[in-house]
């Protein structure tokens, strides 16, 4: 079975946005999603651990926003400044079990986040562990230049949540939902085109009786390999759409902007786009540098994300330890 891409390339960006989106705003409760929207990038379906192998990924993310938009895409909060710095570690395992024409895998990722927020003259800061991302089952398949996967994801409650705090790291609700992706590598990895689709069902925050609306993501990218060493340059992005209304105590949430206009549902929308470059590390590792810019934003912060993501086979640590 041919795998034209290093296993790192797809999973490397599969979690970073969960830490970068653990940030306050408008859409959904506190405006934040528990889900890693937009994080899927290079070879989302082609990049998985080999059978019986484990990969380790480390994510460093810095998010900067000086604007928070209302439902009309206008600035909603004066003197708004948001800074998020996050580190996340992820272990991804291919169990080597074949079923339904594919291979079975799973992964878990834990983000640690530092947030700083100033708005309308008030300032807040918080550190802690955000929502943990757990995928108990993912099924993927490689045939020629077509790679696909299906998976079921879950997000746990953020462990350090405090109802009385104006700023929290992560969300106090769990969530779950299916995802599907496809990667095309028509010239043995020289060209890569990816798409991923997620549908997220949010559970109720029992501390506030707030239920965020369900969310849909379409994540996409296209890249080209330019050197024999495997350096890849491309673009990626995502379309985010909250498809159902926010509700609190069973009633649809109503918001009012600075001009006195009311909107119902508190739904968020955004388009994200930017460049990225992948540098190979050995045969099965890589580092990704990425910049994403928020556009057409409604009921969410509008800013920029800067990422450094590194992934290597977990066995590399064992070999390094034995060599000492």
Where are these regions (language model features)?
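Outer membrane beta-barrel transmembrane domains
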Residues: 61, 69, 75-76, 208-324
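Residues that define the transmembrane beta-barrel architecture of outer-membrane proteins
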Residues: 81-89, 126-132, 170-176, 210-218, ...
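Detector for outer-membrane/organellar transmembrane beta-barrel domains
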Residues: 149-257
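Transmembrane beta-barrel strands of outer-membrane/channel proteins
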Residues: 33-36, 56-64, 106-114, 150-158, ...
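Residues on the lipid-exposed face of transmembrane beta-strands in outer-membrane beta-barrel proteins
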Residues: 46, 58, 88-93, 134-140, ...
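Short loop/turn motifs that connect adjacent beta-strands in outer-membrane beta-barrel proteins
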Residues: 29, 45-53, 95-105, 119, ...
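Surface-exposed strand-loop-strand hairpins of Gram-negative outer-membrane beta-barrel proteins
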Residues: 29-34, 62-86, 120-126
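Long, hydrophobic/aromatic-enriched structural stretches that serve as scaffold segments
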Residues: 82-138
